[in-house]
Curated annotation (Swiss-Prot):
This is Small ribosomal subunit protein uS14. The gene is rpsN. GO terms for cellular component: cytoplasm; small ribosomal subunit. It comes from the Bacteria. It comes from Bartonella quintana (strain Toulouse) (Rochalimaea quintana). GO terms for molecular function: rRNA binding; structural constituent of ribosome. Transmembrane segments: none annotated.
Length: 101
């Protein structure tokens, strides 16, 4: 199990990303638009830099929903390889069976 504080910190980051997503996208579009004057683009980049760091999507870490483990994460299932193996062998994940040949 991951530390509860690390999992909670990641949840707060996810919420902050959702809260600032529209504002960040709007400012980023202004900064990237070559048709807008350089002064306006610079103002937008300053405003973008003033946003909280944790509102950036890259600061969020994919974590297992079951254990909170940050590594060996399967995106489709939103869980780590260890949780996948444990829950799959018990039969809690539909369509997952232990292979044998």
């Amino acid at each position: 199990m991951a530390k509860v504080s690390a999992v909670e910190k990641n949840k707060r980051r996810k919420m902050m990303v959702m809260r600032y997503a529209a504002r960040r996208a709007r400012l980023k579009a202004i900064v990237m638009d070559q048709k807008i004057s350089l002064e306006e683009r610079f103002k937008a980049s300053v405003q973008l830099a003033e946003l909280p760091r944790n509102s950036a999507k890259v600061r969020v870490r994919n974590r297992c929903e079951v254990s909170g483990r940050p590594r060996a994460y399967y995106r489709k299932l939103k869980m780590s390889r260890i949780a996948l193996r444990e829950l799959g062998s018990v039969g809690y994940i539909p369509g997952i069976i232990k292979s044998s040949w």
